[in-house]
């Protein structure tokens, strides 16, 4: 191999690495990490809200594991007109104006869940929610567009309400409210916000 050829190959390799770095930085810049439970072993307490506030007997808990990840689990009961369990993060303003969707990385149990967001901290504040299905035992990434979130209050859809305002997100969480009694388990790796509702193509 000539000196000129070797130099050219090194130049091409350098350009390739530079391009890869630019691509990785671009992808990183297009997302904002809200919670990464792989690196987070301590966090302001997440709040459990179950149907016992309305006389139900469903139970749940939220655990941040020391070896990485978080688990939202429990038992849904339909007794006493109950049937839901939920958890939400501690209040804290997230300005997500430059984003268009939430990205959640998790492993479910085949049940249907809802990802929730609040833009106010009051007890009577509306709860914005977007449903997603899980596949039992499979790691999945769900991209939930802000425009698909529905304003609700105590399980009822609100009409005449503005869409989810990404500039004023105060907390996020998970809700299970399908009419199916029994245990549930959701393993969560991370919660992020992204500019693209569609997953970026691999370089």
How should these model regions be labeled?
Residues 22-203:
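Beta-rich carbohydrate-recognition modules and glycan-binding surfaces
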């Amino acid at each position: 191999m000539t000196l000129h050829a070797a130099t050219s190959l090194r130049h091409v390799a350098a350009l390739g690495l530079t391009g890869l770095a630019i691509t990785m930085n671009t992808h990183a810049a297009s997302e904002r990490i809200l919670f990464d439970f792989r690196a987070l072993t301590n966090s302001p307490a997440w709040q459990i809200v179950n149907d016992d506030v309305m006389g139900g007997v469903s139970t749940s808990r939220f655990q941040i594991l020391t070896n990485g990840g978080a688990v939202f689990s429990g038992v849904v009961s339909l007794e006493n007109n109950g049937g839901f369990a939920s958890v939400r993060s501690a209040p804290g303003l997230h300005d997500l104006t430059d984003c268009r969707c939430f990205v959640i990385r998790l492993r479910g149990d085949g049940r249907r869940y809802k990802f929730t967001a609040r833009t106010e901290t009051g007890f009577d504040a509306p709860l914005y929610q977007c449903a997603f299905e899980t596949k039992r035992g499979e790691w999945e990434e769900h991209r939930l567009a802000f425009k698909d979130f529905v304003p609700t209050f105590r399980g009822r859809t609100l009409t005449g309400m503005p869409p989810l305002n990404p500039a004023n997100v105060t907390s996020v969480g998970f809700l299970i409210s399908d009419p199916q009694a029994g245990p549930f388990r959701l393993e969560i790796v991370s919660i992020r916000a992204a500019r693209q509702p569609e997953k970026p193509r691999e370089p």
